[in-house]
Amino acid sequence: MIRAQPLDSVVLIGGCDKTVPALLMGAASANVPAIMLVTGPMLTGDHKGERLGACTDCRRFWARFRAGEIDAQEINAVNAKLAPSAGTCMVMGTASTMACVTEALGMMLPGGACTPAVMSERMRIAEATGARAVAIAKEGLTPDRIMTPDAFENALTMLLAIGGSTNAIVHLAAMAGRLGIEIDLDAFDRMGRETPVLVDLKPTGQHYMEDLEKAGGMVTILRELRPLLKTKALTITGKTLGQNIDAALPGWKQDVVRPFRNPIFRNGGIAVLRGNLAPGG
């Protein structure tokens, strides 16, 4: 569709799981100036004083219902609170993971990954994205200049640091393939041993995406990961990743993103396995 229309640039609007990588794959193939805008996560719900998030808590309560620990009335009450606003799942599932890795990849404006869908800041991000779409058309800033091997390495580093969805590996490999870039699984396996898990979000941790936003969002993670990042990688701003980090406001005390030297886990949660079922990894 991008190739078929007389477009000078395009805003890619996606949300859940496969929509974001699919849009970026199309943008890579067309190689017309493009910028990603995600819809943003939902806000959390609550049940009997406990915060709820889809899909992590829905599975937990459904298991309790099937085990006879709660009745139909209670599971219905939980269901009514699991998705309290518009947006993608508010845990670090595939949607949130792809939003975060896309910002690290450089195809999204800084701060665009974590802001909840219903917040006024999301509208400001959308407006800024549209303005930047006009600018990249004039500059001729195409996806192949941003989605480079260094940018994909940054995205994979972010995937490990956030404890993100394993689906992202498949998506990133498919995106890279559109640009003739191959994800080196052996290198990724080594990265998994070197990259700490810094983000304490469900389903493996305690917090939700709105908490990550309140903790400063992606730049808080990027700042801690800086020793491992390719900071000279070009981004959609027309500046390097390092310049974007330097331009951000200073961080503040919070408990969602751990310091690099005091991580949740010292190694990433994803490893590459090889064997007769998967000889290529």
Which residues does each PLM region occupy?
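N-terminal small/polar loop signature for handling phosphorylated ligands or for N-terminal nucleophile
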Residues: 1-5
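Short catalytic-loop micro-motif centered on adjacent basic/acidic residues
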Residues: 9-12, 90
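Short hydrophobic alpha-helical runs that function as membrane-insertion/retention elements
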Residues: 11, 34-37
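Catalytic or ion-coupling anion/metal-binding cores of large enzyme and transporter domains
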Residues: 16-20, 26-32, 40-281
